[in-house]
From Swiss-Prot:
GO terms for cellular component: extracellular region. Belongs to the GASA family. The lineage of its organism: Eukaryota, Viridiplantae, Streptophyta, Embryophyta, Tracheophyta. The gene is GASA11. Its main location: secreted. This is Gibberellin-regulated protein 11. Gibberellin-regulated protein that may function in hormonal controlled steps of development such as seed germination, flowering and seed maturation. PANTHER family: EXTENSIN, PROLINE-RICH PROTEIN (PTHR23201), GIBBERELLIN-REGULATED PROTEIN 1-RELATED (PTHR23201:SF2). Residues 1-23 form the signal peptide. Keywords: Disulfide bond, Gibberellin signaling pathway, Secreted, Signal. It is found in: Secreted. One of its GO terms (biological process) is gibberellic acid mediated signaling pathway.
């Protein structure tokens, strides 16, 4: 019976330590959010379909927390933004 109590206590302590480590990792990964609305307004300023462009840009910005600079191209500045694709394999982000 004593062995069972020691085993149970060590298991609970291990779980508690893992919970603290996980909580520390979650709070340390918070990056500051950018203003997607203004970045996408700039990105879509020359688009022939500004509403569609702004919606797609906003989705990409929310996922990647960055928007490629300028009105087109420059996907190398934000690799996540440039790598998102639609189901058809086309670029999702304007």
């Amino acid at each position: 019976m004593a062995v069972f109590r020691v085993l149970l206590a060590s298991l609970l302590i291990s779980l508690l330590v893992l919970d603290f480590v996980h909580a520390d990792m979650v709070t340390s990964n918070d990056a500051p959010k950018i203003d997607c609305n203004s970045r996408c307004q700039e990105r879509c300023s020359l688009s022939s379909r500004p509403n569609l462009c702004h919606r797609a840009c906003g989705t990409c910005c929310a996922r990647c927390n960055c928007v490629a600079p300028g009105t087109s191209g420059n996907y190398d500045k934000c690799p996540c933004y440039g790598s998102l694709t639609t189901h058809g394999g086309r670029r999702k982000c304007p």
